[in-house]
Amino acid sequence: MFKKYKNQDLDMAFWWKKNPKTPSDYARLIIEQLNKFSSPSLTQDNKRKVQEECTKYLIGTKHFIVGDTDPHPTPEAIDELYTAMHRADVFYELLLHFVDLEFEARRECMLIFSICLGYSKDNKFVTVDYLVSQPKTISLMLRTAEVALQQKGCQDIFLTVGNMIIECIKYEQLCRIILKDPQLWKFFEFAKLGNFEISTESLQILSAAFTAHPKLVSKEFFSNEINIIRFIKCINKLMAHGSYVTKRQSTKLLASLIVIRSNNALMNIYINSPENLKLIMTLMTDKSKNLQLEAFNVFKVMVANPRKSKPVFDILVKNRDKLLTYFKTFGLDSQDSTFLDEREFIVQEIDSLPRIISSTTEVSNNNASSSNVASITSPSSVMNNQSSILTHSTSPDSR
């Protein structure tokens, strides 16, 4: 069922014969070993011994939980183990000493944690309920990810803890705790880091947190305007300054969120901002076709909005002709009928926008018409230095 390291079967067979344990002893012995890491008299040799013992106890715990022992544990024995682990705050203590553990031990901890989250009794997720009652463990998990980045050579710790966070997000009660924790905002910063694996893991955590439970996110996160403003600021930074993957994934996340009906508050604030429109239009001219398409999924919502803010309307009017030129080549090679229908609709919406009359053009004698044009083409400061934003072709190959 699980990948085994060299000589694991031999080591475990010897260990079981030498140290038979009752279910509750697993938790006690793990805690005893973890406490040794804090001893001021701990030598490097002794630390290695403690690390080895922790790894063995964690492997033994995993085998017991999945019933991979002889004899197989009874349901009562497994219940006893879960109770003992929760009572001793085993996961909290493991996270406190995560940096001290061996790679194999951290991996076993992640597997045990995932198994425990899925364990149910009487239609209740026992470990999930425990973590809800002890949110300090989730908070420590989020902080441990940051601590790992502050230490040299601890990238694997970040990735392991990241997987544990994603497992938590699958459960609405735990996702709620994560969304409320200020530490979540740090992952927007982690997503901008140059390390590909760290950035990707951070984006996966953010995507999971904001999409796994749409009703929870809309009712308890985006119902707060302060959260919306901060989220937009953070996501825009990723879209503007991140790597290609970061730009694409963050734009994709934003697009998926603003089309959810219950996220109207987020959508209305985002699509009525001229600065946001300028950013999206810039992304639509990226050399990557994939990123262009993700940006289009945001742009189409802005254009289709029947109640555009005046600054947004002015930008679209000012760029009307350039947008129409842009869409002559955009997405023509797509076979997606839905996309093609949306593209055609957006082109029609843009084409229906008023045309700007140049100041050098002879003005009509019709005073009413002249007045109307003047009101539409009044100078706008929104598009300073942006006049050529949509002039280049979308022909480069996608990444």
UniProtKB/Swiss-Prot annotation:
GO MF entries: protein serine/threonine kinase activator activity
Highest taxon in the source lineage: Eukaryota
Pfam families, A to Z: Mo25
Low complexity composition-biased segments: 363-382
Region of interest called Disordered, as start-end residue ranges on this chain: 363-399
Any Gene Ontology CC annotation: mitotic spindle pole body
Matching SUPFAM superfamilies: ARM repeat
Compositionally skewed regions (Polar residues) per UniProt: 383-399
Gene Ontology biological process terms from the UniProt entry: budding cell apical bud growth; intracellular signal transduction; regulation of DNA-templated transcription; septum digestion after cytokinesis
Assigned protein family: Belongs to the Mo25 family.
Note: Present with 1280 molecules/cell in log phase SD medium.
Name of the protein: Protein HYM1
Annotated source species: Saccharomyces cerevisiae (strain ATCC 204508 / S288c)
Name of the gene: HYM1
